[in-house]
C-alpha cells in the first residue's frame, strides 16, 4: 500500500478533507498538524486536541485524546500527529530548529512515497530544505499579495529554484504562480478546496448572541477585514437599499480596520463584531444568517466560500479572481461586476423579495463539493 505524508502549517480545515479523500482511495496517510506550544489553545480549525500531551515534537492523536477527528477517519488508513514547535516566534529559532531536525528526520526515515507540505509561512522553508530530496509537493493557498501585486517571496523562489511540484487551490492562483515560474521549472496544477467538513465536528453553544428587531433576511460579511475586501462598496450598497426603503439586516464580523466601520456601527439594522472570531462564533454567525457577502475588489481564492456553503448560505460576490470558479451565478450565488454598487444592491434585493430564488440558491450551496460544481 502506498503511504504519503501531509504536513500542514495552518490551513488545517482544507488539508484534513484532502487526507480523507486520499485515504478513501486506499492510500495510507500520515497527517502532521504544525502547532505552537507557547500559544497553544488546544484547538485549531478542524481539530480539538486539548487532551493531547503538551510537549514539543511529535504527538500522536488517538480516539482518547482527540475522539472527534479520529472518528472522522474511522475505518480509513489515516494516522494523525501534532507537530508541535516551541513557538512560532522567530526569537526561538534555535529551539525550533532542534525540533524540526528531530521530527523531520523521523519523517524522512518513514520512506513515504510522497510528501505534501501545506502552507507558505517562512518556517516552511526549513521543512522544504530538509525534505527537498524526497518526492515533495507544496500546496500554496496564496501567491504573494494579490492586493499589492507582489508575487515573489523567498520561499517561492526556493521552491522554483529546486523545481518542486506545486498545487494551487484555484485557476487564478495557478496562473499567478506560473507567471512567477516563467521558465516552467515546476510541475504545477490546480486542485480546488473540498468540503471543510471537520469544522462541523465541534459545534457547540456560543456566548455570542445577536438579535434583530425584524424578520428580514440577515446578510453576513465575515473574515479578516482588509481594504481589498470592499467594505466601502458595501457601504454604498447599504445606502442604495436604504434609499429604496428595503428592509434587511447585516452583520460585519472580523478583526482588522476599515474607515467605513463607524458607518456600520451607527446603523440599527447592522451589528459589527470587530475582533478575531472563534470557530464556534463563525459557525453561529453562519447558522443565523441567510446570505454571505463578498464585495471584494480583488481575490485569489477564499476559504469563506466552502465554509459558508456547508451551512447552505449562498454568496453574493463580485467577479474578481477565483471567486467566479466556485460561485456559480444563479446556482449557489449571484455574481456582479466589481465596484458595481447598484448591481450588488439589486442582487441583495432579489433575495430579499424572491423566496423561490433564495431556496434555489441555498440548495445549490449545499451541493458544493459533491462533484457538480
Residue ranges and their predicted role:
Residues 12-16, 92-104, 115-133:
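An aromatic- and histidine-rich active-site surface loop
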Residues 161-202:
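Donor nucleotide-sugar binding/catalytic pocket of nucleotide-sugar-dependent glycosyltransferases
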Residues 212-229, 235-238:
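Conserved donor-binding/catalytic core segment of Leloir-type glycosyltransferases
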Residues 260-284:
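Nucleotide-activated donor-binding/catalytic signature segment of Leloir-type glycosyltransferases, i.e.
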Residues 291-294, 314-317, 327:
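Short hydrophobic beta-strand element within catalytic cores of glycosyltransferases
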Residues 296-298:
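Aromatic "clamp/platform" in nucleotide-sugar-dependent glycosyltransferases that forms part
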Residues 306-307, 320-330, 334-335:
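Short acidic/histidine- and often glycine-rich active-site loop of Leloir-type glycosyltransferases
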Residues 343, 350, 357-372:
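A short, well-ordered alpha-helix in the C-terminal region of glycosyltransferases
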Amino acid at each position: 500500500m502506498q503511504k504519503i505524508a501531509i504536513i500542514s502549517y495552518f490551513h488545517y480545515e482544507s488539508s484534513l478533507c484532502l487526507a480523507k479523500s486520499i485515504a478513501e482511495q486506499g492510500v495510507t496517510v500520515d497527517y502532521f498538524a504544525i502547532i505552537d506550544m507557547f500559544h497553544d489553545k488546544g484547538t485549531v480549525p478542524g481539530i480539538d486536541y486539548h487532551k493531547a500531551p503538551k510537549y514539543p515534537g511529535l504527538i500522536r492523536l488517538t480516539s482518547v485524546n482527540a475522539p472527534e477527528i479520529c472518528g472522522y477517519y474511522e475505518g480509513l488508513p489515516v494516522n494523525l500527529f501534532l507537530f508541535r514547535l516551541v513557538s512560532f516566534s522567530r526569537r526561538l529559532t534555535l529551539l525550533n530548529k532542534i525540533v524540526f531536525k528531530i521530527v523531520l528526520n523521523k519523517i524522512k526515515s518513514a520512506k513515504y512515497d510522497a510528501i505534501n507540505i501545506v502552507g507558505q509561512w517562512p518556517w516552511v522553508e526549513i521543512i522544504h530544505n530538509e525534505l527537498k530530496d524526497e518526492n515533495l509537493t507544496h500546496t500554496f493557498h496564496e501567491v504573494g499579495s494579490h492586493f499589492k501585486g507582489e508575487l515573489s517571496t523567498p520561499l517561492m523562489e526556493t521552491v522554483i529554484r529546486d523545481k518542486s511540484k506545486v498545487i494551487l487551490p484555484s485557476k487564478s492562483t495557478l496562473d499567478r504562480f506560473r507567471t512567477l515560474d516563467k521558465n516552467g521549472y515546476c510541475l504545477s496544477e490546480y486542485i480546488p478546496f473540498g468540503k471543510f467538513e471537520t469544522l462541523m465536528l465541534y459545534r457547540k453553544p456560543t456566548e455570542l448572541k445577536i438579535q434583530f428587531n425584524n424578520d428580514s433576511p440577515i446578510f453576513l460579511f465575515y473574515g479578516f477585514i482588509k481594504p481589498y475586501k470592499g467594505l466601502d462598496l458595501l457601504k454604498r450598497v447599504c445606502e442604495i437599499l436604504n434609499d429604496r426603503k428595503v428592509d434587511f439586516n447585516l452583520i460585519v464580523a472580523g478583526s482588522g480596520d476599515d474607515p467605513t466601520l463607524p458607518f456600520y456601527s451607527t446603523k440599527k439594522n447592522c451589528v459589527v463584531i470587530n475582533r478575531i472570531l472563534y470557530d464556534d462564533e463563525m459557525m453561529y454567525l453562519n447558522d443565523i444568517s441567510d446570505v454571505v457577502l463578498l464585495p471584494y475588489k480583488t481575490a485569489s481564492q477564499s476559504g469563506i466560500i466552502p465554509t459558508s456553503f456547508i451551512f447552505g448560505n449562498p454568496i453574493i460576490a463580485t467577479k474578481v479572481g477565483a471567486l467566479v470558479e466556485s460561485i456559480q451565478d444563479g446556482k449557489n450565488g449571484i455574481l456582479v461586476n466589481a465596484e458595481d454598487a447598484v448591481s450588488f444592491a439589486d442582487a441583495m434585493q432579489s433575495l430579499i423579495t424572491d423566496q423561490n430564488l433564495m431556496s434555489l440558491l441555498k440548495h445549490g450551496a449545499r451541493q458544493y463539493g459533491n462533484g457538480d460544481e
